[in-house]
Amino acid sequence: MIRFISDLTVLFHAMAGRKKSAMGTTQFINQKMLQEAPIFSKKKIDNSEFKPQHPLTHLVVANNFIVMALANKTLKRRDLEDPTSKEEEIDLKKTIMRTSAKISKLFLDPTGNHLLIAVKSALENDNPALYYLHKTWTQPRQLFKFDKILITAVGWNHAQMDALDIKKTGPILIGTTVGKILETELNAEEGFLGNAFGMTNQVETDPKELYKIEKGQSNQDEKVTGLQYFLSKLNSQKYFITVTTPTRLYQFIGTVPRSDTRPLLAPVFNKYLRGSEYVRPLSELPPSSRKSSSLSFFFNQEKREYNQILNPEKIGWMSELFLFWGGIQANNDDRTVIDPQNRRSIPFEVSGSEDDIPRQAFITEFHALILYKNKLRGICLLNDQEIFVDQHDGTLVGMAQDQMKNIFWVYTEYSVFKYQVSNEGRHVWRIYLDQEKFLEAERLAQMHAHDQPEALDIVRIRQAEKLYSDGKYIESAMTYAKTKTSFEEVTLKFVDLEDKTALKNYLKKKLENLKPSEATQSTLVIMWLIEIHQNQLGTMRQCGKNSDDQKKMYQSEEKEFFLLLSLPQVEKCIKENKEVVYNLLGSHGDMRSLVHLAEILNDTERVIRYNLANKQFDKVLELLASAGDQRLVYTHCHALLSSDPARTVDRLMTMDRVDPLKLIPAFMNVTQSNPEVVPHCVR
């Protein structure tokens, strides 16, 4: 009896396994980054592009449109999208800037069309003010309905970004120093509400207070430091709103039955005002930690389609003590949009020095840029690893993000630097791999296959190893089959397992991937598969097929084996090694499979011999009649006449192409040895 498995086991145990690298992920990534272009490439804006004569106090950028505020109460702006455009300068001293007033903050919408200028005074008796400057205007206009209100955050209408009317903002949210959230709309068109209301040239609608954030732990009003709202791409009536204060991060989720409702977002906040939903912060800091707070989002702009809603994929909130980030779920959960399985906090080192207090942070898909007094840090969100530190000689005034272009701008009083994100996920697959997040690792490895062709194989090998160690042998085998791991190394892992299903599945998958030129290995794999199937069928036969379940299991295994034999690649191999396969099947006593194989190979003579041995003469006669090979008739006529003369002669008389002269030897031999046959032969 042939036993391929035993022989191959000895062979594979004699082969040496591969050596694995001991290099850690962090060490590997750091070495690679020294050789490659940086993830965040830095460029200082040339003096020909930017020539500040006075200190720079504020800078905002959106859709390649940059606006800068200078200490001499002027604005500079330029359309970076148009290389022929020139820098515009707007003098604010005559229009909005009193002697004691200064710009508190600039707010530019993601399209770059709408700019809000918050102004405050150093004098206690002077009220704050808010001004609006459209991209097409040369002077800002005061929004009188926001007198005495110092705004600290703006939630722009992202659903308006693809609107053809660039002079309307749609509903926007306004956050204030005392924790109020207001809603208004801006319209740059002349005569917005018309003379009928006595408010010609009014730009803003009446601001409506929708909500007030509760006081902090020290019983003081909490100013709104970050504010954004989004319409769900899955539900055209569902909105989610994110609000941050110096110590808290909130989310509000609700539906708006009609998009023409004004104020639009009142229904979302109303359910929290009624108490039907309890507002509790997602994250909270002790009351002493109140110096820094910034909110940011990551949008995958590559997925943006015209006139289609693009929701952010990640949220980031920076406080003095930590950076919180989370993935945003695209589902219909009314409790949270932040994925509880994909969120974490990255703590900051607390030294007490002002130099070490983070001032601003923006997140990308996998990283965060954190601004300090005189340095910019880049860290990986997935493992907290610091990827760079950019030290600056002067004090860094601030940082801005161009959300549409995924570009970051850092500025001092007299310098501006641009940081461009480039291929930031190039090594992230290794981080996911170390965290055993194989689906994410495989997705990113596939994305970077052009510059890291080995990545996908590394991921799959590690996944296969993990599945094997967890006892998931079939899944492990199928994963190994997708790798370039040597055939010997993989089979060595599975050959000693009592259940050969995993090995069988691996061999089948391996067979699918073998090239026609690899005939020797194909033959080895096919023979091994036949042996495994035969062992499994033999074990089932020995255990019996008494119950229905046993019968079904046997039939299923046999069907799977017959399917293997019918594959063109297998059939070709068997034809070239026919006797070996017949002997193998015969050694297991599996005549059904042997006959089935002979039928597949059109090996009629072998089938005839099998049926003669089992006295199935009718089947033999049918085969002879249908085969059309008269040689087989002459060869087996003697045996048939001896065993069943009547039916044999009946069938012979129907075969027109049989030569009677060639039947005479068989007839004479039979009649001489058995005279009882004569009446059937002479008619």
Language model: regions and residue ranges:
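N-terminal amphipathic/basic-hydrophobic helices that include classical n-h-c signal peptides
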Residues: 1-14
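WD40-like beta-propeller blades
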Residues: 12, 16-365, 371, 375-400, ...
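Extended non-globular scaffold/tether segments
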Residues: 252-262, 267-587, 591-598, 604-683
